[in-house]
Amino acid sequence: MSNSIRYISLEPVNLKTTYSEYDTIEFDVIFSGRKLRLNNIRLAADIATPNATPTTGDLRTKNTINDFQLDPMVGAHSFIDSISTEFSNAGKNSGTVESLQEYPRYAKMYYAGTQTMDGQMGSACACELRCPSMKCSNVLLRGGQAGKAAAQVYIPSNPHELANFSVRPRFLLNSVSSAQGEPMLSERQVGSCRISIRLSRFSNVFNGAGAIADITSYSLANVRLLYQTYADDGTDMPLVARTKANIKQNVNGNAITLNARLPIMANSMTASFFPVEDMNSAQKNTLALPEPPAVSRLEFSFNDSTNSYISYELRDKNSILQRAIQSLNPMDETNAVSLDMIKSGDMYMIGLGWESFIDLSRQKFSLLLNSGIGSSATDYTLYSYFHGILEM
């Protein structure tokens, strides 16, 4: 019996009936005498809005609030504004080992650069409220109905279930590999583990005209962390986790420079832009990846692991986008997206991958961008994410 899998449904430390925008939810993951199965940690919850009741669902009827949705590529990941991981064990990996801010935008960039919209139709996406279109997202938010004919699905008097989700966040404990097989983490390696999640503001979760006129807030109920543990066999696997660190800055000139020093061993970076004037608009999709005006030159420069100066200069859009796609999978993971697909989806990113890992706490990474932003009507925010590793 001791070797059996245990399926854990963990309540938050700061337990409440519901959580809303800006709330922090904390989970203490304790697995004494057991091993934590990595890459399978999920956040689950029910979604409620002021209009939601047991008989109306989240969006009431088909003809009411039909312009209200999540970003379809991000789905319920958009509820997670930030996620951090903290280990209690004394040693090189004690304290906060990853603190990923602006998480929904990272999720959007990752899925936009690695998956097609058709790939969003599987069951693994549906449970995360990820889907192929805005219209589909609107339907998912209405809540489920069982045993009803298609023509009756949107009748207000028919009982609905509240929409719910189960997402696998792309954070440190879900991004681990081991040469010895499926990665398992023992308490000896890290001690106890605390996962802290801060919820996004309403305008960064939902978008559409209905997000202004009809629904202006949300809450999450029955929030829980789902994971599995196995009996501890007394051995510790060497583990390597993919980790992320991010920074953002305002861009208001035709020539801008980003100089980054971050506590991460990185081998790639990816970035995207968004107009400052639209950042707080619930009507706009704040996770969109628009192209800034008149980008004419992009240059990356840094010293590599041998302290040799490296510089990459890109001038045409195809080269810029191709490098960005490659930067999301620097370890040669599967990538279903082609350059034509990301261009046709009106999604713009910049990025670069390089051959060896560099310590960005000691080496400065620089980015120079020439564009027409300074001559445009609005400033932009540049969101930069650096991808690295952490040995556990």
Which ranges hold each PLM region?
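Short, low-complexity Pro/Thr/Gly
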Residues: M1-M392
